[in-house]
Amino acid sequence: MNAALDDKAAKKAAFEGNKLAKRLRHHVGDAINDFNMIEEGDRVMVCLSGGKDSYTLLDILRGLQKSAPINFSIVAVNLDQKQPGFPEHVLPEYLKSIGVEYRIVEEDTYSIVKRLVPEGKTTCSLCSRLRRGILYRVADELGATKIALGHHRDDILHTLFLNMFYGGKMKAMPPKLVSDDGRHMVIRPLAYCREKDIIRYADWKAFPIIPCNLCGSQPNLQRQVVKEMVNDWDKRFPGRVESMFRALQNVVPSHLADPKLFDFVGLQTGDAPFADGDTAFDKEEFRDPAPDADDVEDAPKKRTISILDSRGKESGCGA
């Protein structure tokens, strides 16, 4: 009896895990296609920290690599910043076991950060800048044409609210960007993926997670407050987070207040219809949006399947 129950539970777990993997693959494939993140012949450097996000990113990209209509290579890179207690053996052992090309870069940024940042203050900002410079250098050494980071949809929304609340800017975290010096292309293939899906996926795959608090830095309190706020909205108003993310993809500059984005000064009347006109007076149909279809359907939406299955071989990456 117990054996039968265990077998049934195992089959159910496998079914749910495969469904989750399929959803994440479609979300990643969608983002890659929508933003032209990966092209024929690209060498993608996946930045691997040892956390759930970067493990998931590497795993999903390797799966897409096998079925994509284009050819691209992957090299995983981990920056060992010499934090006390960092388990140096974990990532090399894992990467060898899955047979992926990798490089471990050893740079003692931990000592630099501890020397420059007062005790008790968050070190994340300086640490991030130092890490970014090193990764750009390594990308050059490896001949990488794309640098893939593990930021997901929730990270993008959190950054939007942080900039609004504390920086006075309508600015989020782009799915694709060029570095300040114009020489490196950074991509975020998990841009459409929900953190809660990534957490479940990492647990299902049993990745050897390395804790992110080894440096002893205090967490970014502002980011934590924003994260808790968004998570609360997600629980109380299902579908609202999806709606907020869609807003980032449906910007109407003529109905904001930035004269750098829209020529309010030069606005003139005329006889011809004006596309950016009085839509502000359209009937309001505000309501709580429906939850993400992923929560109520087993399969991805037809739109997603169409994008992944019908694009030409010369473009993008499919599942």
Swiss-Prot record:
Motif (PP-loop motif): 49-54
Region (Disordered): 276-319
Subunit structure: Homodimer.
Species of origin: Chromobacterium violaceum (strain ATCC 12472 / DSM 30191 / JCM 1249 / CCUG 213 / NBRC 12614 / NCIMB 9131 / NCTC 9757 / MK)
EC class of the enzyme, as a word: transferase
Domain of life where this protein originates: Bacteria
Catalytic activity annotation: cytidine(32) in tRNA + S-sulfanyl-L-cysteinyl-[cysteine desulfurase] + AH2 + ATP = 2-thiocytidine(32) in tRNA + L-cysteinyl-[cysteine desulfurase] + A + AMP + diphosphate + H(+)
Descriptive protein name: tRNA-cytidine(32) 2-sulfurtransferase
Record note on cofactor: Binds 1 [4Fe-4S] cluster per subunit. The cluster is chelated by three Cys residues, the fourth Fe has a free coordination site that may bind a sulfur atom transferred from the persulfide of IscS.
GO biological process per UniProt: tRNA thio-modification
UniProt GO molecular function: 4 iron, 4 sulfur cluster binding; ATP binding; magnesium ion binding; sulfurtransferase activity; tRNA binding
Main location: cytoplasm
Record flagged with keyword RNA-binding: yes
Other observations noted: The thiolation reaction likely consists of two steps: a first activation step by ATP to form an adenylated intermediate of the target base of tRNA, and a second nucleophilic substitution step of the sulfur (S) atom supplied by the hydrosulfide attached to the Fe-S cluster.
Amino acids binding [4Fe-4S] cluster: C124, C127, C215
Enzyme Commission no: 2.8.1.-
SUPFAM superfamilies according to UniProt: Adenine nucleotide alpha hydrolases-like
Compartment(s) of residence: Cytoplasm
Entry cofactors: Mg(2+); [4Fe-4S] cluster
Pathway in which the depicted protein is active: tRNA modification
GO CC terms in record: cytoplasm
Family statement: Belongs to the TtcA family.
Basic and acidic residues bias: start-end ranges: 280-290, 310-319
Known role: Catalyzes the ATP-dependent 2-thiolation of cytidine in position 32 of tRNA, to form 2-thiocytidine (s(2)C32). The sulfur atoms are provided by the cysteine/cysteine desulfurase (IscS) system.
Keywords: 4Fe-4S, ATP-binding, Cytoplasm, Iron, Iron-sulfur, Magnesium, Metal-binding, Nucleotide-binding, RNA-binding, Transferase, tRNA processing, tRNA-binding
Short name of any one Pfam family annotated for the protein: ATP_bind_3
